[in-house]
């Protein structure tokens, strides 16, 4: 079963593990991830922003996080994506669409 939902506080550790896999996958492109900074960013998004996780048969396979911010040229706000990560094995249109639809 496919499900996209906001994680509860107990699921944030699982989200942290998933996002650290992003660093492993792209280690030749990005600097080493600071686990503390990643954890703080996740907590900030949980408390003040937006997080949505994708689960397939109860297994976390993807996540998107965003924060409301102002345009640089306007006082109007928009939802700025901080991360969007899906495990390589699960990268399908259905999963990415499910995550991004929650941002509306």
Task: Please report, for each region that a protein language model flagged, where it lies by residue.
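A conserved beta-turn-beta hairpin within the catalytic core of GNAT-like acetyltransferases
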Residues: 70-81
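Short, basic/aromatic recognition patches
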Residues: 37-41
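Short amphipathic alpha-helix that is part of the acyltransferase structural core
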Residues: 1-34
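Conserved acyl-CoA
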Residues: 98-104
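A short helix-loop-beta-strand connector motif used in the catalytic cores of GNAT acetyltransferases and
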Residues: 42-53
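Conserved beta-strand in the GNAT
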Residues: 53, 59-68
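A short, internal acetyl-CoA/4′-phosphopantetheine-binding micro-motif in the GNAT/acyltransferase core
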Residues: 82-93
